[in-house]
C-alpha cells in the first residue's frame, strides 16, 4: 500500500 506521500 502506498499512501501517496513518498510511499
Swiss-Prot record:
Signal peptide: none annotated. Keywords: Antimicrobial, Fungicide. GO terms for biological process: defense response to fungus; killing of cells of another organism. Transmembrane segments: none annotated. Has antifungal activity against B.cinerea. Inhibits HIV-1 reverse transcriptase. Inhibits HIV-1 reverse transcriptase with an IC(50) of 10 uM. This is Ascalin. It comes from Allium cepa var. aggregatum.
